[in-house]
C-alpha cells in the first residue's frame, strides 16, 4: 500500500493523510457514518476499513458519486443540475439515518453547500481536509514549531 511506503520513507517525520484524518473525526464521535467518494475510493474500502480500525461497532454506509468530480471540474458548483445529481446520490445515505457524512474526495468541499442543503443540519459534514489541517496544527504545536 502506498501509505505504508510513505510512512516507511518518512521515518520520524509525521505523515498526515486525509483518510486517516476523516476517519478519526467521524469514528471517534459517531456510530452511523456515511461516506461519499469517487467509485475508485469506495471500491477500495479504504474508509470503512480505517473507520472500523478505530470503531469496530460503527455502521458505515458508502456511496459512490461518480459525477461530482466532473461537475466540479466543469464549474457546476451551484448549478441546478448538481442539486439534482446530489439528491440522487445522497438519498440512500439519508435513508440510513447517518449521524455524519465524510466527504471522501478533495473535490467535494467545493460543493458542500449543496450537500448540506440536501442532507440537512441534523447530519454533520466531516471535511477531511479541515481535520488534516487541525492535525497538522496539533503536531506543530506539540513540537513547538507553530509560528
Segments predicted by a language model, with ranges:
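Non-catalytic structural scaffold of enzyme domains
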Residues: 1-147
Amino acid at each position: 500500500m502506498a501509505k505504508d511506503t510513505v510512512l516507511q520513507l518518512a521515518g520520524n517525520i509525521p505523515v498526515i493523510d486525509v483518510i486517516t484524518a476523516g476517519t478519526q473525526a467521524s469514528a471517534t464521535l459517531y456510530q452511523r457514518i456515511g461516506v461519499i467518494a469517487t467509485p475508485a475510493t469506495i471500491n477500495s474500502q479504504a474508509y470503512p476499513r480505517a473507520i472500523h480500525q478505530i470503531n469496530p461497532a460503527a455502521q458505515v454506509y458508502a456511496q459512490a458519486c461518480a459525477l461530482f468530480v466532473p461537475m466540479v471540474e466543469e464549474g457546476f458548483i451551484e448549478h441546478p443540475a448538481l442539486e439534482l445529481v446530489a439528491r440522487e446520490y445522497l438519498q440512500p445515505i439519508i435513508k440510513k439515518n447517518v449521524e455524519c457524512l465524510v466527504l471522501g474526495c478533495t473535490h467535494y468541499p467545493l460543493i458542500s453547500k449543496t450537500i448540506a442543503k440536501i442532507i440537512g443540519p441534523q447530519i454533520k459534514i466531516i471535511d477531511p481536509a479541515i481535520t488534516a489541517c487541525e492535525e497538522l496544527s496539533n503536531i506543530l504545536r506539540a513540537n513547538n514549531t507553530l509560528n
